Amino acid sequence: MAPPPPSAANVSQPVIDSLSAPPPADTVTQPLAVVSEKLPWRHTFISLKVPNFRIFAIGHFIAVIAIWMQRIAQDWMVLQLSGSVTAVGITVALQFMPSLFLGPWGGMIADRFAKRKILIICQSAAAVLAALLAVLSLSQRVEVWHVYVIALALGFVTVLDQPARQVFVNELVGPKYLRNAISVNSTTFQLGGLIGPALAGVLLTALGAGWAFAANAVACCSTVAMLLILRKDQLHLSQPTPRKKGMLREGLNYALSKPTIYWPWLMAGFVAVFAMSLPVLLAAFADHVYDAGAGGYGLLNAMVALGALAGAVASTRRRQLRLRSVVTSAGLYGLMLCVSSLMPTMVWFSVTMVLAGFWCLMFLTAANQMVQTSSNMSIRGRVMSLYLVVLIGGQAIGGPMMGWLAEHLGPHLAVLISGGVPAIAAVVVAVVLARKSSLHIKVDLRDRRRVLRIVQEPQTV
């Protein structure tokens, strides 16, 4: 049973930009209802009631398990072949670098063509690349440069895949269940991230990296099959945007005119560059600090995924989506990374990784939801591609940088910097937003449930 429609008493409407001249109709964001009441627990994953989205989520879950297996196996194989954490960072950078330079064009293509067809082509290409890496590894002919080339090729696939995948969720469920579907997608991603590293650790120890790559090739094929069986008549298809001059500039101007888009972009930039290269740092901790081997590396990644899974589920229960949610989550993620740098043993380090994973996902889902619900379908592909340029491109910069810091300054100081910069940025942004909105913290010792509250100062006439 679907949740009741929100009443006027508990729905807030975003502010629509007021300009001296009316903007084009396709770039005006219509008011989007934001439900402020807490939904019953039975509606936590209500978007799965949509048959097409349920099929997509199952395929996504299988694919995520396999891609996590490939990521762990790929990073560990590069570390073993080269003996260098920096080489692992370069691999990450090559996989993300195309999105940094070509991401906006990927978003423009997502706005102009059918998202489902784009995803089918991209997943087919990913299957071929994974199969090639599996053959090289199983034949024991793989070299570091092979991994570099395949990682770069996969990066070009990601340029088209990611913006189309982000916008396709809306075509599966429609605007009614969009926020919930984004959270469910994050939940399946993190659940797969919990299972994938654990399976990767077993495969690396028992059979070798090649079988992890082979599993990902099969999973990509299964994703293609599930995309093909989706019912077209149940898709919420949007009209393709006709080609015209200045489409990329239009998307950028649109995003920069909306605080609910550009502030999440800014925080995503700090988090992506400094705090999204955890696999690089975890490889350094597993190999150089705790001497835990491939199994320990998989375990640390699984701990992050466990916390992220909890964060993804918690994000489905979020009553309201505000800028303060985005900034606070980013700040707490950075703080948890700082705390982890002080942990004396692998057990305590693993505990802080669970907390870091939780707040990382609370931030990522909040930022994603806010950017998507603040933009119209006709321009959303370009807006999301620019957001992904910041998020993925930041990782391309941060991967080698954090690898270099871990090698030359040590893993502990590297993870302290990794968390410290986003935490400081969150504090600065919070102060700026508070001043713009005349907000301050109120202490009320009589209210045990809400001792601290953020309130707006009354405006003087």
Where are each of the predicted segments found?
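Alpha-helical transmembrane-bundle signature of multi-pass membrane transport and export proteins
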Residues: 2-461
